[in-house]
Amino acid sequence: MRNGYKRIAMIGLVALAAGCANSVSVRPGAEVTRFHLGNNPARGEIAIEPLDPALRGSFEFSRYAAAVERQLATLGWRVVQGSRSEQVALVRVEQSTREAMRRESGFSIGLGGGTYGRNVGIGGGLTLPIGGARAGQIVVTELGVRLQRRSDGAAIWEGRAQGEAVAGTPAAARAAAVDRLAVALFQGFPGESGRTIRVR
Protein backbone atom coordinates (compact mmCIF):
# COMPACT_ATOMS: atom_id res chain seq x y z
CA MET A 1 0.00 0.00 0.00
CA ARG A 2 2.85 2.30 0.90
CA ASN A 3 4.41 1.68 -2.53
CA GLY A 4 1.09 2.59 -4.10
CA TYR A 5 1.09 5.95 -2.32
CA LYS A 6 4.66 6.60 -3.45
CA ARG A 7 3.73 5.82 -7.05
CA ILE A 8 0.77 8.19 -6.92
CA ALA A 9 2.98 10.90 -5.42
CA MET A 10 5.59 10.47 -8.15
CA ILE A 11 2.93 10.67 -10.87
CA GLY A 12 1.65 13.87 -9.27
CA LEU A 13 5.12 15.44 -9.24
CA VAL A 14 5.72 14.55 -12.88
CA ALA A 15 2.37 16.05 -13.85
CA LEU A 16 3.16 19.21 -11.89
CA ALA A 17 6.55 19.56 -13.56
CA ALA A 18 5.00 19.06 -16.99
CA GLY A 19 2.39 21.69 -16.22
CA CYS A 20 5.06 24.20 -15.25
CA ALA A 21 7.12 23.47 -18.37
CA ASN A 22 4.09 24.00 -20.59
CA SER A 23 3.30 27.33 -18.93
CA VAL A 24 6.52 29.11 -19.88
CA SER A 25 5.49 32.47 -21.27
CA VAL A 26 7.51 34.31 -23.91
CA ARG A 27 6.34 37.77 -24.88
CA PRO A 28 5.71 37.62 -28.65
CA GLY A 29 7.39 39.87 -31.19
CA ALA A 30 9.74 42.67 -30.17
CA GLU A 31 9.41 45.71 -27.94
CA VAL A 32 10.67 48.68 -29.96
CA THR A 33 11.46 52.28 -28.96
CA ARG A 34 12.83 54.96 -31.31
CA PHE A 35 14.03 58.55 -30.77
CA HIS A 36 14.57 61.28 -33.36
CA LEU A 37 14.07 64.99 -34.00
CA GLY A 38 10.96 64.61 -36.12
CA ASN A 39 12.60 64.65 -39.54
CA ASN A 40 13.42 61.76 -41.83
CA PRO A 41 17.24 61.44 -41.96
CA ALA A 42 18.93 62.10 -45.30
CA ARG A 43 20.21 58.97 -47.03
CA GLY A 44 23.76 58.60 -48.25
CA GLU A 45 26.89 56.68 -47.35
CA ILE A 46 26.99 55.17 -43.88
CA ALA A 47 29.42 52.94 -41.98
CA ILE A 48 28.35 50.39 -39.38
CA GLU A 49 30.55 50.21 -36.29
CA PRO A 50 30.30 48.53 -32.88
CA LEU A 51 29.54 50.67 -29.86
CA ASP A 52 32.24 48.64 -28.09
CA PRO A 53 35.51 49.26 -30.00
CA ALA A 54 36.82 45.89 -28.80
CA LEU A 55 34.38 44.16 -31.17
CA ARG A 56 35.63 45.99 -34.26
CA GLY A 57 36.61 43.50 -36.97
CA SER A 58 35.31 40.47 -35.05
CA PHE A 59 33.28 37.71 -36.68
CA GLU A 60 30.64 38.12 -34.00
CA PHE A 61 30.06 41.78 -34.83
CA SER A 62 30.12 41.15 -38.58
CA ARG A 63 26.97 39.04 -38.19
CA TYR A 64 25.19 41.80 -36.28
CA ALA A 65 26.35 44.42 -38.76
CA ALA A 66 25.01 42.36 -41.66
CA ALA A 67 21.54 42.32 -40.11
CA VAL A 68 21.58 46.11 -39.67
CA GLU A 69 23.09 46.64 -43.13
CA ARG A 70 20.21 44.80 -44.80
CA GLN A 71 17.69 47.13 -43.20
CA LEU A 72 19.65 50.32 -43.92
CA ALA A 73 20.11 49.30 -47.55
CA THR A 74 16.37 48.71 -47.88
CA LEU A 75 15.78 52.23 -46.55
CA GLY A 76 18.13 53.79 -49.12
CA TRP A 77 21.52 54.02 -47.42
CA ARG A 78 24.72 52.80 -49.05
CA VAL A 79 26.84 50.98 -46.49
CA VAL A 80 30.59 51.57 -46.86
CA GLN A 81 33.66 50.35 -45.03
CA GLY A 82 36.12 52.55 -43.20
CA SER A 83 35.79 55.99 -41.68
CA ARG A 84 35.19 58.18 -44.74
CA SER A 85 31.40 58.40 -44.40
CA GLU A 86 29.83 61.33 -42.58
CA GLN A 87 27.10 59.11 -41.17
CA VAL A 88 27.81 56.17 -38.88
CA ALA A 89 25.57 53.55 -37.29
CA LEU A 90 26.74 52.47 -33.84
CA VAL A 91 25.45 49.01 -32.95
CA ARG A 92 25.09 47.37 -29.56
CA VAL A 93 23.85 43.84 -28.77
CA GLU A 94 23.18 42.56 -25.26
CA GLN A 95 21.84 39.18 -24.21
CA SER A 96 20.83 37.89 -20.79
CA THR A 97 18.50 35.34 -19.25
CA ARG A 98 15.65 35.55 -16.80
CA GLU A 99 13.69 32.87 -15.06
CA ALA A 100 10.47 32.15 -16.86
CA MET A 101 7.38 32.35 -14.70
CA ARG A 102 3.96 30.80 -14.97
CA ARG A 103 1.59 32.50 -17.38
CA GLU A 104 -0.91 33.04 -14.56
CA SER A 105 1.39 35.48 -12.76
CA GLY A 106 0.07 38.65 -14.41
CA PHE A 107 1.90 41.05 -12.09
CA SER A 108 5.25 42.58 -12.87
CA ILE A 109 7.62 45.36 -11.91
CA GLY A 110 9.49 47.12 -14.70
CA LEU A 111 13.16 47.59 -13.97
CA GLY A 112 14.17 50.60 -16.07
CA GLY A 113 17.51 50.72 -17.79
CA GLY A 114 19.82 53.61 -18.45
CA THR A 115 22.07 55.06 -21.06
CA TYR A 116 24.99 53.19 -22.52
CA GLY A 117 28.53 54.12 -23.45
CA ARG A 118 29.21 57.25 -25.49
CA ASN A 119 25.99 58.80 -24.19
CA VAL A 120 23.83 56.53 -26.32
CA GLY A 121 20.43 57.20 -24.83
CA ILE A 122 18.84 53.84 -25.56
CA GLY A 123 16.78 52.55 -22.65
CA GLY A 124 17.29 49.00 -21.50
CA GLY A 125 16.20 46.78 -18.66
CA LEU A 126 13.99 43.76 -18.12
CA THR A 127 10.51 43.22 -16.77
CA LEU A 128 10.61 40.45 -14.18
CA PRO A 129 7.21 38.93 -13.31
CA ILE A 130 6.46 38.35 -9.64
CA GLY A 131 4.75 35.21 -8.38
CA GLY A 132 4.26 31.94 -10.21
CA ALA A 133 6.48 28.87 -10.30
CA ARG A 134 9.89 28.58 -11.93
CA ALA A 135 9.66 26.91 -15.29
CA GLY A 136 13.00 27.25 -17.06
CA GLN A 137 14.77 30.24 -18.55
CA ILE A 138 14.01 32.88 -21.13
CA VAL A 139 16.77 34.48 -23.21
CA VAL A 140 16.33 38.24 -23.61
CA THR A 141 18.19 39.88 -26.53
CA GLU A 142 18.41 43.62 -27.08
CA LEU A 143 19.64 45.39 -30.21
CA GLY A 144 20.46 49.10 -30.01
CA VAL A 145 21.37 51.27 -33.01
CA ARG A 146 22.35 54.93 -33.06
CA LEU A 147 22.71 56.86 -36.33
CA GLN A 148 24.93 59.89 -35.90
CA ARG A 149 27.14 62.36 -37.72
CA ARG A 150 30.80 61.48 -37.58
CA SER A 151 31.99 65.08 -37.64
CA ASP A 152 30.37 66.18 -34.38
CA GLY A 153 28.86 63.00 -32.93
CA ALA A 154 25.35 64.46 -33.03
CA ALA A 155 22.57 61.88 -32.98
CA ILE A 156 20.33 61.65 -36.05
CA TRP A 157 18.18 58.74 -34.89
CA GLU A 158 18.44 56.02 -32.29
CA GLY A 159 16.41 53.08 -31.15
CA ARG A 160 16.36 49.74 -29.45
CA ALA A 161 14.46 46.49 -29.93
CA GLN A 162 14.15 43.76 -27.33
CA GLY A 163 12.85 40.24 -27.82
CA GLU A 164 12.58 36.95 -25.97
CA ALA A 165 12.99 33.26 -26.77
CA VAL A 166 13.10 30.01 -24.81
CA ALA A 167 16.65 29.06 -23.88
CA GLY A 168 18.11 26.27 -26.00
CA THR A 169 15.90 26.91 -29.03
CA PRO A 170 17.20 28.18 -32.41
CA ALA A 171 15.32 31.45 -31.88
CA ALA A 172 17.45 32.18 -28.80
CA ALA A 173 20.75 32.17 -30.75
CA ARG A 174 22.28 35.65 -30.88
CA ALA A 175 22.55 35.91 -34.66
CA ALA A 176 18.99 34.72 -35.24
CA ALA A 177 17.65 37.03 -32.55
CA VAL A 178 19.48 40.05 -33.98
CA ASP A 179 18.13 39.30 -37.46
CA ARG A 180 14.56 39.44 -36.13
CA LEU A 181 15.18 42.50 -33.98
CA ALA A 182 16.76 44.47 -36.84
CA VAL A 183 13.65 43.95 -38.96
CA ALA A 184 11.42 45.08 -36.10
CA LEU A 185 13.60 48.05 -35.19
CA PHE A 186 13.56 49.60 -38.66
CA GLN A 187 9.96 48.74 -39.50
CA GLY A 188 8.04 51.94 -40.27
CA PHE A 189 11.28 53.97 -40.05
CA PRO A 190 11.82 56.47 -38.50
CA GLY A 191 8.85 55.57 -36.30
CA GLU A 192 7.09 57.61 -33.64
CA SER A 193 9.70 59.24 -31.40
CA GLY A 194 9.63 58.32 -27.73
CA ARG A 195 6.88 55.72 -28.01
CA THR A 196 7.40 52.07 -27.13
CA ILE A 197 5.48 49.66 -29.34
CA ARG A 198 5.33 45.89 -29.80
CA VAL A 199 6.14 44.71 -33.32
CA ARG A 200 4.96 41.18 -34.09
Regions found by a protein language model. Give the residues of each.
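Surface-exposed short loop/turn segments
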Residues: 92-152
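C-terminal/domain-edge helix-coil "capping" segments
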Residues: 20-38, 131-200
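Extracytoplasmic/secreted proteins, especially bacterial periplasmic and envelope-associated proteins
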Residues: 63, 67, 88, 176-184
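A structural "domain/chain start" motif
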Residues: 2-7, 20-75, 84, 194-200
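Acidic helix-start/capping segments at beta-turn-to-alpha-helix junctions
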Residues: 80-100, 200
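Envelope-exposed proteins and targeting segments
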Residues: 42-44, 64, 75, 85-89, ...
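Structured segments of extracytoplasmic/periplasmic soluble domains
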Residues: 67-78, 96, 184-192
